[in-house]
Design a protein with these regions (language model features):
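Conserved histidines in hydrophobic membrane contexts and catalytic metal-binding motifs
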Residues: 1-410
Length: 410
């Protein structure tokens, strides 16, 4: 009874989310190589002559005059290439400018975020709006159910061999089971660590962490403001944290950078969006351990916040670490290759599942009978409570199963 129930829900979960998991596998693999893709797409715009850089204030003024827009963010890369500047037009439209730091020329303009932003939005389906992002969140929740039920089914007949030929059902069953057994743990890790980016669950977690002070550094006493839409340049734990506000006045970006020298040589600078807002620097790093954010009072040049990874609480450190591993950055190239292998395994699971199901369907074994066992029901209820959007679709799936059973009994 339990095995039939687990198999039924493993199949139901797969039918719900296989296309989305395939999408996540392909776009996730591409995102792992976002740096290489960006350098290939923008090769002409990134190449600059090696020479001393102009003062940041001069660069900002030059880019503003050339684009007719206000520079809101400056990113200095670690490589000797063009700087990136985000500019905001009077109508609110934002674009990304590639700038030669040696003379201030704009080498190219593209949409805000560039190709990296496109890959990120494709991966999360945010490019389609809130509905698409919600579907990806649902898929990630169901992926957790798929992996756990799949492990249980495989454990009933543990085998890591592939027998027969592709013409037989056994080949595809063995291929699916062996792939899931070998790669399932990493797929489960990706599903869980990807949740903090989701639109509903992720924002809820982020708001909770921010509101309760669980993990993010405590902001200094005084007035606080938002990030003016630039929170994505910060570590996840600080993207909705209030920033300390200072007095009126502006010392300029060069003096602000001089005050924040400890942030390193590769950084993102967010310029004050409103009077009293600080200059906000975030180190461009790969490892979560190297995260560093510095806020400089625009009026006085005083450092009003200096937050490093060690200043985060255990909860925030765990989330930041998970995100860095998820992106294949925390442990260098081996980390990226493991994540790439997980994407390949997930894609193989997505392809083999419908083939396996179709080959058993003509024999009358398409959807196994049986309800939901008590233990499995409690597990799914817990998963549904933890991930509400997934829980709603679980209820819908349960309703469909009940209807099918009722129709089959007539």
């Amino acid at each position: 009874m339990l095995q039939r129930a687990v198999w039924r829900w493993h199949l139901v979960a797969g039918l719900f989310v296989l296309p989305f998991l395939g999408w996540l596998a392909v776009t996730g693999a591409l995102y792992l190589y976002k740096t290489e893709i960006e350098r290939a797409v923008y090769a002409e715009w990134l190449s600059v002559e090696a020479r001393p850089t102009l003062p940041i204030g001069t660069l900002v003024a030059s880019v503003g005059a050339e684009t007719g827009a206000r520079v809101v963010q400056v990113a200095r890369p670690s490589a000797p290439e063009a700087w990136r500047m985000t500019v905001a037009a009077p109508n609110g439209t934002r674009r990304l400018a590639f700038v030669d730091p040696g003379d201030g020329r704009v080498l190219g303009l593209t949409r805000a975020g560039g190709i990296t932003g496109v890959l990120r939005e494709l991966h999360s389906l945010a490019i389609t709006g809130p509905i698409g992002n919600a579907l990806i969140e649902i898929a990630a929740g169901w992926a957790i159910v798929l992996v756990l039920t799949g492990f249980w089914l495989w454990a009933q007949r543990p085998r890591l061999t592939v027998r027969g030929s592709p013409n037989g059902r056994g080949f595809w069953r063995d291929l699916h089971g062996s792939t899931g057994a070998l790669g399932g743990a990493v797929v489960l890790f990706l599903a869980i660590t990807g949740m903090p980016w989701s639109g509903v669950w992720g924002r809820g977690l982020q708001s909770l962490v921010t509101a309760q002070g669980w993990g993010r550094p405590t902001a200094p006493a005084g007035e606080h403001g938002g990030h003016g839409g630039h929170g994505a340049a910060l570590p996840w734990s600080m993207q909705h944290a209030a920033m300390p506000m200072g007095g009126a006045g502006d010392i300029g970006p060069d003096r602000a950078l001089a005050a924040a020298r400890g942030v390193g040589t590769a950084w993102t600078m967010t310029l004050p969006a409103t009077p009293g807002a600080p200059y906000l620097f975030s180190a461009l790093v790969a490892r979560a351990d190297d995260a560093h954010v510095v806020a400089v009072d625009a009026a006085s040049g005083r450092i009003v916040q200096d937050a490093r990874y060690a200043d985060f609480g255990a909860g925030a450190r765990a989330i930041e670490w998970g995100i860095a591993v998820h992106q294949g950055q925390q442990y260098g190239e081996p980390n990226r290759l493991v994540m790439l292998a997980a994407c390949a395994a997930l894609l193989l699971l997505v392809v083999s599942a419908p083939v396996m199901w179709w080959r058993r369907r003509p024999r009358g074994l398409g959807m196994p009978p049986g309800g939901t066992g008590r233990g499995l029901g409690l597990l799914m209820a817990a998963a549904g409570a933890a991930f509400p959007l997934t829980g709603l679709t679980m209820l819908a799936a349960l309703g469909l199963v009940r209807v099918q059973g009722w129709l089959g009994g007539r």
